[in-house]
Amino acid sequence: MASGKIAAFRDFSAAAMPNVLRLTDLISEGKLAGKRVFIRADLNVPQDDAGNITEDTRIRASVPAIRAALDAGAAVMVTSHLGRPTEGEFKPEDSLAPVAVRLSELLGCEVKLVQNWVDGVDVAPGQVVLLENCRVNKGEKKNSDELAQKMAKLCDVYVNDAFGTAHRAEATTHGIAKFAPIACAGPLLGAELDALGKALGQPARPLVAIVAGSKVSTKLTILKSLADKVDNLIVGGGIANTFMLAAGLKIGKSLAEADLVGDAKAIIDLMAARGASVPIPVDVVCAKEFSATAAATVKDVKDVADDDMILDIGPKTAAQLADQLKASGTIVWNGPVGVFEFDQFGNGTKVLAEAIAASSGFSIAGGGDTLAAIAKYGIADRVGYISTGGGAFLEFLEGKTLPAVEILEQRAQRQEALA
């Protein structure tokens, strides 16, 4: 990694997260031995109808914080939400029981599941317990101070290691951090913020963003935020169709939002005014219908017919964009550029994914469809950082304050003032 990139990363970290206390700081200072540590993790994993965990990435990602606290001699409590339970009404399908089993396998020790834990938890140093689904507790979603104060009394140290919920102000992500004796960021949360800071703070140039998806409306704030920052803004999917309309091109019966053409044109003009660009496709892959068996036809953009649906970028466009990505210093990737679930409309996403993997620049990727594309094309080990954040990742790109991070910043400043 070039020294310039490291410097950019450090500069942004200092600016974006002033003095946020980290779990690693406490461990290096020997401050966890014998302490009660409450870790808010993100263990919200998918399950099949029988309750079997189908994908355990989030559980595996939570292990380093838990292991570090155990090794430091702490009594460890871990909680998470799972699904969308009704507060005050616990149902079997809301239980973290399968997660407790998987955690015990990964940690190599017993992980007891504790019900009705708000008023007290029995755990000894060197032990870890999993506290049942925190969203079952009344007041969790509304960030109740009463609930948060009860939870804060359970611990000496609160650790937020759940970047995926950092955009939500809830009792276990925000309220408890106000009242716990010490509040800090865990290694997963810290790594997410470092990676995002590296990509957007003082990034190595050129900075290229890929923002794709079906609708401009859902990502308009992100597009406008990035238009101020990036050198190239690559758009894909239905979003690209709206930008093609803004550029005066025909898109047939493709998915687009005619009412947002003005916004798209404003973004194109804003980028052009500062010497940046929104590359408009020169060729596209069309079909007459949206289906897994639809025949794919490559066309120049000027040849799109009235009954065509654009379902991918064409090979010339993909090659041009791949060259830009390979030459970039920093890449932010959110969304596939075509309907990659159907192989005949997946070439654009595949070519860009391989270009990102081949780039010597720093890359960060996030969003469910993006992660699925990374898995499909086997490039996970060649992406600089893969965000587990989902909604939090998108809100960071929008330039929004993440409540769970903001409270850690405030606590760090208070803790420093008292030191």
Swiss-Prot record:
Binding-site list for ATP: K219, E341, G367, G368, D369, T370
Residues involved in substrate binding: D42, L43, N44, R58, H81, L82, G83, R84, R135, R168
GO cellular component term of the entry, any: cytosol
Enzyme Commission (EC) number: 2.7.2.3
Keywords for this protein: ATP-binding, Cytoplasm, Glycolysis, Kinase, Nucleotide-binding, Transferase
Pathway assigned in UniProt: Carbohydrate degradation; glycolysis; pyruvate from D-glyceraldehyde 3-phosphate: step 2/5
Alphabetized GO MF terms: ADP binding; ATP binding; phosphoglycerate kinase activity
Annotated compartments: Cytoplasm
GO biological process: gluconeogenesis; glycolytic process
Main location group: cytoplasm
Catalytic activity reported: (2R)-3-phosphoglycerate + ATP = (2R)-3-phospho-glyceroyl phosphate + ADP
Subunit record text: Monomer.
Family assignment from sequence similarity: Belongs to the phosphoglycerate kinase family.
Protein's UniProt name: Phosphoglycerate kinase
UniProt source species: Ralstonia nicotianae (strain ATCC BAA-1114 / GMI1000)
